Amino acid sequence: MANILKTIIENDKGELRKLEKMADKVLAYEDEMAALSDEELQAKTEEFKKRYADGETLDQLLFEAFAVVREGAKRVLGLFPYKVQVMGGIVLHHGDVPEMRTGEGKTLTATMPVYLNALAGKGVHVVTVNEYLTERDATEMGELYSWLGLSVGINLAAKSPTEKKEAYACDITYSTNAEIGFDYLRDNMVVRAENMVQRPLNYALVDEVDSILIDEARTPLIVSGPVSSDTNQLYHMADHYVKSLDKDDYIIDVQSKTIGLSDSGIDKAESYFKLDNLYDIENVALTHFIDNALRANYIMLLDIDYVVSEDQEILIVDQFTGRTMEGRRYSDGLHQAIEAKEGVPIQEETKTSASITYQNLFRMYKKLSGMTGTAKTEEEEFRETYNIRVIPIPTNRPVARIDHSDLLYPSIDSKFKAVVQDVKERHEKGQPVLVGTVAVETSDYISKKLVEAGVPHEVLNAKNHYKEAQIIMNAGQRGAVTIATNMAGRGTDIKLGEGVRELGGLCVIGTERHESRRIDNQLRGRSGRQGDPGESQFYLSLEDELMRRFGSERIKALLDRMNLSDEDSVIKSGMLTRQVEAAQKRVEGNNYDTRKQVLQYDDVMREQREIIYAERHDVITADRDLSPEIHAMIKRTINRIVDGSSHSDQDDKIEAILNFAKYNLVSEDSISDSDLEGKSDQEIKDYLFERALEVYDSQIAKLRDEEAVREFQKVLILRVVDSKWTDHIDALDQLRNAVGLRGYAQNNPVVEYQAESFRMFNDMIGSIEFDVTRLMMKAQIHEQERPRTERAISTTATRNISAKAPNMPDNADLSNVKRNDPCPCGSGKKFKNCHGRKK
């Protein structure tokens, strides 16, 4: 272990030596750039672009380009990047993460690699965690970029598609991670190429990269539409039943935060819902409602996991920032179950139309880098998931902050009593204090206690984060006391007021250890910026969430040995800190394993999504007749139907193929048994394809010009693809839940998921081609005048496609259709799951 650690440290040192040499080359241009006039310095941008176009690489331009940005920043912003900032910029350009402490000027560091990569003209995305930082950084740094001749765009959720397209067309685009993800998904749902807003994803520089790529890695971005179903009553019934349970009726696993019914709970459910067996196949939907009601009532906590807004809406609280996540909803019915629990209006369920996780979104960029003050603890995950190295950058000035050892109290009450006393004493001497909490509930509790103690303070949590930047900016003033949920206000520097340095600087007090060491380090890092003095102190209790879930037994034993009878007794020891860090490492390991598994599942979806989106993009951008592609779909559909019927005896086979042809290819009275009898399978395939092409040509002939034909073909294909893809996503979600149970049968759930999803994907492709064939053959296309506008073309095409194939006639003879044959109605389903379903 010691050897591994030594190797890592030596590698870091070697990397830093290389970076220092490169930074010195940038600094060597300092006098040359200072001697240039404004016009000469600004002209460098066009010179670099020309040199890049003539074959020079960005790596070759780096030293001079970085020097131009340094000089430009000095003239425009009054800021001159230090050598360590130049080193950080080089790391960013190479597609890695420089770990730079809070207050070391990460925003200014980013200007150099952003400028350099923007010279290529392929777009640079600077990604921030919220829109306040997006606008702030784009406005402040945009001055420099504009002065140097580069265009800057700001992408906000409220902007129109036209404004978004303009923002993405700029050399540099500032945006939140969520908005880039949603724009990507929406771009893959449009019908016309001109409605897409993004260019191909080129280079992303992610601010607070650990927050986005690690903490939010599991969060799927979902574009969804409503599902018409009257299920509100079931949510209320399940909630009412769950609230009637005693503690013995359910089992909670505190460590994994899972819950299930005990035998007595199952008995009560069968009695309450009047069932013979709760786990009969017919009751699968009901058990899902009960499971969600259990989670909502006994796992999900008000003011910790979510808050109820003034508008009676359930808002999710981000566990890593303490902010509410506007517009986000728990999936799979959990959000509705919480609404039932809290007695607020239940919003309708939705069906996923498109989704992607941040892991797979950001892995699509050609080059990815990011900045943070705390990434080294997650180095393995950055390397394994994103192929990114983490390189610690030295501070410009030595860190003067004093980090005190943790204090452990027997109970939460005694802990908070000590926190309030400490805050009061520091406030009275004028030292500013930042109190960090992990939950809204804790913030409110400490606030109440400080009011009782007569200590004036500001509270910053999920309930009032609109003024967070202003509150955080004032947190370093003399006598200021600020309570902040976790890392709220991250990205905004706390600058010390007059006379505060002499009082010891800002004191950060942590009221609980977070499950991630990185989050604790971020809280500590709010103090002691740029060599300022400061202090940090964590207060813990045996009743804290982390201590309850992981590793508290040894610490309890330690307490017993010390025989602490006084409630206000406190432990302060190195062993305690080591035990807490060991507990945090276990949680981090669990979370990493979970994220890895999510990625394994999502990689399956990613491969399928990329195939569908690539095909979709090809259709949207095609400036040609798509008849060859549609002909191929028709041919494959016919082949599948004929091959699928070959196992039947001759009469049954002819009957099944005839029904398919009548209801999906040609008019009913234009084909009969005699047309198919006596032919081999290949001859039947050739005959039906020939007949289908005749119908296809007659359908196309009804459209008066090539533009109308292309529009009709595009809308037809896209409509079918989007419908089937949405159903497929829904089916994959259900499959993922189902394969989890197969793990109990000693099967690997991920392997099962991969195999089953591959089969389902192939089925979906067949279903897409079947529907395109059926709609193409049976759509009722009316002769029309040439439409005057694109909108008219689209409307007409959509209206034409809306004409469905005729339903199965009441007197249709289905006696010879086998259960596993395709249903002759043309639904694409097997007969047993369609018109052959037992009533």
Curated annotation (Swiss-Prot):
Record membrane topology: Peripheral membrane protein
Basic residues bias: start-end ranges: 829-839
Native organism: Streptococcus sanguinis (strain SK36)
Gene expressing this chain: secA1
One GO BP: intracellular protein transmembrane transport
Name of the protein: Protein translocase subunit SecA 1
Residues involved in Zn(2+) binding: C823, C825, C834, H835
Functional summary from the UniProt entry: Part of the Sec protein translocase complex. Interacts with the SecYEG preprotein conducting channel. Has a central role in coupling the hydrolysis of ATP to the transfer of proteins into and across the cell membrane, serving as an ATP-driven molecular motor driving the stepwise translocation of polypeptide chains across the membrane.
Cofactor note: May bind 1 zinc ion per subunit.
Subunit and partners: Monomer and homodimer. Part of the essential Sec protein translocation apparatus which comprises SecA, SecYEG and auxiliary proteins SecDF. Other proteins may also be involved.
Cofactor: Zn(2+)
